[in-house]
């Protein structure tokens, strides 16, 4: 399984992740990205059909704010750093 979360502290609201993976990432009122699957907690497995989109977003993030892991983040984007 794969999990994803956005580090809102480093996100610059560029819009790249939502363009790459609109079924996973959306934006708050300030344009800061978050994961829609679990309100950015990183605890819901990303469906297999969305893994390619997620990896495109992960690789395309200019600030490395998109985090991906094999275990849940439990709400902490820096859990595995």
Swiss-Prot record:
Binding site for [4Fe-4S] cluster: 11, 14, 17, 61
SUPFAM superfamilies: 4Fe-4S ferredoxins
Coiled-coil annotated spans: none
Any Pfam family the entry gives: Fer4_13
Binding note for cofactor: Binds 1 [4Fe-4S] cluster.
Reported cofactor(s): [4Fe-4S] cluster
Protein's job: Ferredoxins are iron-sulfur proteins that transfer electrons in a wide variety of metabolic reactions.
Protein name per Swiss-Prot or TrEMBL: Ferredoxin
The organism of origin for this protein: Bacillus thermoproteolyticus
């Amino acid at each position: 399984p794969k999990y994803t979360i956005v580090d809102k502290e480093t996100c610059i609201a560029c819009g790249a992740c939502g363009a790459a993976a609109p079924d996973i990432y959306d934006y708050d009122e300030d344009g800061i990205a978050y994961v829609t699957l679990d309100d950015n907690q990183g605890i819901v497995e990303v469906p297999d059909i969305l893994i390619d989109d997620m990896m495109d977003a992960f690789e395309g993030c200019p600030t490395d704010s998109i985090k991906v892991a094999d275990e849940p983040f439990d709400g902490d984007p820096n859990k595995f750093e």
